[in-house]
Amino acid sequence: MEIRVEREISFRQAVHGRLLVDGDRVCDTLENGATCMKPGSYPLVRSYSLFSAANGIHRLGEKIAVGEWQYLGFLVRTQPVREQLLTYIRQLRHRQVPLVLVISEEGMQRL
């Protein structure tokens, strides 16, 4: 199953996007442009969580903040959105569904 992050807007160090699971939009994303992962495909493994409940870009490192887009550089409802996403991922893992994270910058606007 594919979990996809489509990066849409880059403004200073903030990179906004959206997260899709098998093509269905689940939530918005926020990353630190200076430290975010390179575009590509990554198998999701249990040893490390890529998803964060942070509402700003500072201290994110390579993690991806999930939530609802409020304005450039800021998300809201990060904790409940992260918990819903992680619960869904745990259910898929329990059913032994292979998961891959795809990060795309196709069509990203730089402001």
For every predicted segment, state its role.
Residues M1-L111:
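Cell wall/extracellular polymer interaction/catalysis modules
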